[in-house]
Amino acid sequence: MAENENTKKRNRREEILQALAHMLQSSDGSHRITTAKLAANVGVSEAALYRHFPSKTRMFDSLIEFIEDSLISRINLILQDEKDTITRIRLILVLILGFSEKNPGLTRIMTGHALMFEQNRLQGRINQLFERIEVQIRQVLKEKKLRDGQGFSYDESLLASQLLAFCEGMLSRFVRSEFHYRPTQEFEARWPLLLAQLQ
């Protein structure tokens, strides 16, 4: 019986988070989302929302945890499965852009647009996530010298920030275009431009 209650509670939590992500994807996402609007969207009372989450901040925390877990775990898989530096970089970029494309509502969180009206701590978590990804990209670039005996013409820190800035720009464009301009759009055409910097 207790197991059924826990499953129901978990399902309701997921339903609330999915509703929030969906609202972030819709035109509601460009404005502050209130718990009243969210409760109406889920079809429950505000009190019911607070039975599952102590605050809206905690809901955003849960969505950010999902973003972190999804990206970092997959980056780790790429690093585990692939040894070629350029292949690793390409796959990491495609992962970030593809994740964004599949999760438009979460992209508003990743770009900070959805967090403008929320606690600063949430933006700090997103900043830390991107810093962590940049560190991983920089490490991949540095390992080339160890593996191949030859590094890049440019400093690895500069290259890592440039590659991540490209991703962040594509994510911002996705949000700005109301999700019409897909982050992976024209990636094949853009890749040689990025690759030219990795000499």
UniProtKB/Swiss-Prot annotation:
Main location per the UniProt record: cytoplasm
Domain HTH tetR-type as annotated: residue spans: 10-71
InterPro entries: DNA-bd_HTH_TetR-type_CS, Homeodomain-like_sf, HTH-type_TetR-like_transc_reg, HTH_TetR, NO_SlmA, SlmA-like_C, Tet_transcr_reg_TetR-rel_C_sf
Subcellular location: Cytoplasm, Nucleoid
Residues of the signal peptide: none
Gene Ontology biological-process entries: cell division; negative regulation of division septum assembly
Function: Required for nucleoid occlusion (NO) phenomenon, which prevents Z-ring formation and cell division over the nucleoid. Acts as a DNA-associated cell division inhibitor that binds simultaneously chromosomal DNA and FtsZ, and disrupts the assembly of FtsZ polymers. SlmA-DNA-binding sequences (SBS) are dispersed on non-Ter regions of the chromosome, preventing FtsZ polymerization at these regions.
Protein name per Swiss-Prot or TrEMBL: Nucleoid occlusion factor SlmA
Source organism (scientific name): Photorhabdus laumondii subsp. laumondii (strain DSM 15139 / CIP 105565 / TT01)
